[in-house]
Protein backbone atom coordinates (compact mmCIF):
# COMPACT_ATOMS: atom_id res chain seq x y z
CA UNK A 1 0.00 0.00 0.00
CA UNK A 2 2.73 2.43 0.92
CA UNK A 3 4.66 1.80 -2.29
CA UNK A 4 1.60 2.03 -4.49
CA UNK A 5 0.29 5.27 -3.03
CA UNK A 6 3.35 6.90 -1.49
CA UNK A 7 1.83 6.69 1.98
CA UNK A 8 -1.60 7.02 3.49
CA UNK A 9 -3.02 10.10 5.05
CA UNK A 10 -6.67 9.41 4.38
CA UNK A 11 -8.52 6.27 3.45
CA UNK A 12 -12.12 5.59 2.58
CA UNK A 13 -13.17 1.99 2.92
CA UNK A 14 -16.13 0.83 0.87
CA UNK A 15 -16.43 -2.74 -0.26
CA UNK A 16 -19.35 -4.42 -1.93
CA UNK A 17 -20.05 -6.71 -4.80
CA UNK A 18 -21.03 -4.54 -7.77
CA UNK A 19 -24.56 -5.17 -8.90
CA UNK A 20 -25.90 -6.57 -5.63
CA UNK A 21 -29.34 -5.41 -4.68
CA UNK A 22 -29.62 -3.11 -1.68
CA UNK A 23 -31.84 -5.60 0.12
CA UNK A 24 -33.13 -9.07 -0.60
CA UNK A 25 -36.80 -9.72 -0.03
CA UNK A 26 -36.48 -13.23 1.39
CA UNK A 27 -35.98 -13.92 5.14
CA UNK A 28 -32.57 -15.08 6.36
CA UNK A 29 -33.49 -18.78 6.49
CA UNK A 30 -34.29 -18.67 2.77
CA UNK A 31 -31.06 -16.89 1.84
CA UNK A 32 -28.17 -18.85 0.38
CA UNK A 33 -25.32 -19.11 2.88
CA UNK A 34 -22.88 -17.74 0.32
CA UNK A 35 -24.59 -14.33 0.66
CA UNK A 36 -23.62 -14.15 4.32
CA UNK A 37 -20.10 -15.35 3.55
CA UNK A 38 -19.68 -12.89 0.69
CA UNK A 39 -21.05 -9.98 2.72
CA UNK A 40 -18.56 -10.65 5.48
CA UNK A 41 -15.65 -11.45 3.16
CA UNK A 42 -16.08 -8.55 0.75
CA UNK A 43 -17.42 -6.18 3.40
CA UNK A 44 -16.34 -6.77 6.97
CA UNK A 45 -13.11 -8.68 6.36
CA UNK A 46 -12.05 -6.25 3.64
CA UNK A 47 -12.80 -3.30 5.93
CA UNK A 48 -10.72 -4.88 8.71
CA UNK A 49 -7.85 -5.72 6.36
CA UNK A 50 -7.69 -2.33 4.65
CA UNK A 51 -8.01 -0.49 7.97
CA UNK A 52 -5.28 -2.63 9.50
CA UNK A 53 -2.87 -1.97 6.65
CA UNK A 54 -3.73 1.72 6.44
CA UNK A 55 -3.47 2.18 10.20
CA UNK A 56 0.07 0.81 10.24
CA UNK A 57 1.18 3.53 7.84
CA UNK A 58 -0.83 6.23 9.59
CA UNK A 59 0.46 5.28 13.05
CA UNK A 60 4.00 5.63 11.73
CA UNK A 61 3.24 9.19 10.62
CA UNK A 62 1.06 9.93 13.69
CA UNK A 63 -1.86 11.17 11.58
CA UNK A 64 -4.55 9.99 9.23
CA UNK A 65 -8.23 9.43 8.59
CA UNK A 66 -10.06 6.20 7.84
CA UNK A 67 -13.72 6.53 6.83
CA UNK A 68 -15.59 3.23 6.76
CA UNK A 69 -18.74 3.40 4.67
CA UNK A 70 -21.71 1.97 6.53
CA UNK A 71 -25.45 2.60 6.69
CA UNK A 72 -28.49 2.77 8.94
CA UNK A 73 -29.02 -0.98 8.52
CA UNK A 74 -26.44 -1.27 11.31
CA UNK A 75 -29.02 0.17 13.71
CA UNK A 76 -32.38 -0.74 12.18
CA UNK A 77 -33.81 -3.63 10.19
CA UNK A 78 -33.84 -2.60 6.54
CA UNK A 79 -34.88 -5.75 4.78
CA UNK A 80 -31.93 -8.12 5.00
CA UNK A 81 -30.35 -9.70 8.07
CA UNK A 82 -26.91 -10.34 6.55
CA UNK A 83 -26.67 -6.76 5.26
CA UNK A 84 -27.63 -5.32 8.65
CA UNK A 85 -25.20 -7.58 10.50
CA UNK A 86 -22.36 -6.60 8.15
CA UNK A 87 -23.07 -2.89 8.63
CA UNK A 88 -23.29 -3.35 12.42
CA UNK A 89 -19.94 -5.14 12.32
CA UNK A 90 -18.47 -2.24 10.34
CA UNK A 91 -19.67 0.25 12.95
CA UNK A 92 -18.33 -1.91 15.80
CA UNK A 93 -14.95 -2.30 14.08
CA UNK A 94 -14.81 1.46 13.61
CA UNK A 95 -15.56 2.20 17.29
CA UNK A 96 -13.08 -0.37 18.58
CA UNK A 97 -10.32 0.56 16.14
CA UNK A 98 -10.82 4.23 16.99
CA UNK A 99 -10.42 3.36 20.67
CA UNK A 100 -7.17 1.51 20.01
CA UNK A 101 -5.84 4.39 17.89
CA UNK A 102 -6.92 7.13 20.29
CA UNK A 103 -3.36 8.08 21.24
CA UNK A 104 -1.91 7.59 17.75
CA UNK A 105 -3.33 10.63 15.96
CA UNK A 106 -5.44 8.50 13.60
CA UNK A 107 -9.17 9.16 13.22
CA UNK A 108 -11.68 6.46 12.30
CA UNK A 109 -15.33 7.15 11.53
CA UNK A 110 -18.31 5.30 10.12
CA UNK A 111 -19.76 7.39 7.34
CA UNK A 112 -23.39 6.95 6.30
CA UNK A 113 -24.28 8.25 2.85
CA UNK A 114 -27.89 8.80 1.91
CA UNK A 115 -29.46 7.30 -1.19
CA UNK A 116 -26.58 7.37 -3.65
CA UNK A 117 -27.27 7.66 -7.36
CA UNK A 118 -25.26 4.61 -8.36
CA UNK A 119 -25.75 2.92 -11.70
CA UNK A 120 -28.02 0.30 -10.12
CA UNK A 121 -30.13 2.92 -8.31
CA UNK A 122 -30.52 4.91 -11.52
CA UNK A 123 -31.37 1.74 -13.44
CA UNK A 124 -34.19 1.08 -10.95
CA UNK A 125 -35.07 4.77 -10.48
CA UNK A 126 -38.80 4.10 -10.64
CA UNK A 127 -38.51 2.31 -7.28
CA UNK A 128 -36.78 5.21 -5.50
CA UNK A 129 -37.61 8.79 -4.59
CA UNK A 130 -34.45 10.50 -5.85
CA UNK A 131 -35.44 13.99 -4.65
CA UNK A 132 -33.03 13.78 -1.69
CA UNK A 133 -30.44 11.52 -3.30
CA UNK A 134 -26.69 12.10 -3.43
CA UNK A 135 -24.15 11.81 -6.22
CA UNK A 136 -21.35 9.32 -5.81
CA UNK A 137 -19.01 12.29 -5.37
CA UNK A 138 -20.89 13.71 -2.38
CA UNK A 139 -19.50 11.21 0.13
CA UNK A 140 -16.03 12.07 -1.21
CA UNK A 141 -16.69 15.71 -0.39
CA UNK A 142 -17.63 14.62 3.12
CA UNK A 143 -14.32 12.80 3.50
CA UNK A 144 -12.41 15.78 2.09
CA UNK A 145 -14.13 18.07 4.62
CA UNK A 146 -13.23 15.72 7.47
CA UNK A 147 -9.65 15.47 6.25
CA UNK A 148 -9.40 19.28 6.23
CA UNK A 149 -10.71 19.65 9.78
CA UNK A 150 -7.82 20.18 12.21
CA UNK A 151 -10.11 19.00 15.04
CA UNK A 152 -11.29 15.81 13.29
CA UNK A 153 -10.00 13.60 16.14
CA UNK A 154 -12.97 14.73 18.22
CA UNK A 155 -15.18 12.77 15.82
CA UNK A 156 -13.18 9.54 16.03
CA UNK A 157 -15.27 6.43 16.62
CA UNK A 158 -18.51 8.16 15.70
CA UNK A 159 -21.16 7.42 13.12
CA UNK A 160 -21.43 10.45 10.84
CA UNK A 161 -24.04 11.18 8.17
CA UNK A 162 -22.62 12.61 4.94
CA UNK A 163 -25.47 15.11 4.47
CA UNK A 164 -25.12 16.35 8.06
CA UNK A 165 -21.43 16.93 7.38
CA UNK A 166 -22.46 18.92 4.30
CA UNK A 167 -24.49 21.21 6.53
CA UNK A 168 -21.76 21.40 9.19
CA UNK A 169 -18.87 22.10 6.82
CA UNK A 170 -20.83 24.03 4.18
CA UNK A 171 -20.39 21.87 1.09
CA UNK A 172 -23.07 20.74 -1.33
CA UNK A 173 -23.42 18.12 -3.99
CA UNK A 174 -22.05 18.44 -7.52
CA UNK A 175 -25.47 19.60 -8.76
CA UNK A 176 -25.47 22.44 -6.22
CA UNK A 177 -28.12 20.83 -4.03
CA UNK A 178 -27.76 20.31 -0.30
CA UNK A 179 -29.08 16.84 0.57
CA UNK A 180 -31.08 16.66 3.77
CA UNK A 181 -29.66 14.24 6.36
CA UNK A 182 -31.67 11.03 6.64
CA UNK A 183 -32.39 10.02 10.23
CA UNK A 184 -32.68 6.57 11.77
CA UNK A 185 -36.45 6.94 11.86
CA UNK A 186 -36.58 7.76 8.13
CA UNK A 187 -34.17 5.05 6.99
Residue map of PLM features:
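Hydrophobic structural elements of the Rossmann-like NAD(P)H-binding subdomain
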Residues: 1, 67, 108-111, 121
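Catalytic loop of short-chain dehydrogenase/reductase
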Residues: 6-7, 13, 17-35, 40, ...
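A short, exposed helix-loop element centered on a Lys and neighboring polar residues
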Residues: 51-52, 95
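Helix-to-beta-strand junctions that scaffold the AdoMet/dcAdoMet cofactor pocket
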Residues: 58-61, 102
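Conserved Rossmann-fold SDR core element
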Residues: 91, 101-116, 152-160
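C-terminal helical subdomain
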Residues: 110, 128-187
Amino acid sequence: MNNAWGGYEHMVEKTAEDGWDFTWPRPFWEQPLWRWDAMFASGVRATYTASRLGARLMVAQKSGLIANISFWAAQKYLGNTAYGAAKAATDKLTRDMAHELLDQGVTLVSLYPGLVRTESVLRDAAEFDLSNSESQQFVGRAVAALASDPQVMRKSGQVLVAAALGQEYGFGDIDGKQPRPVTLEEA
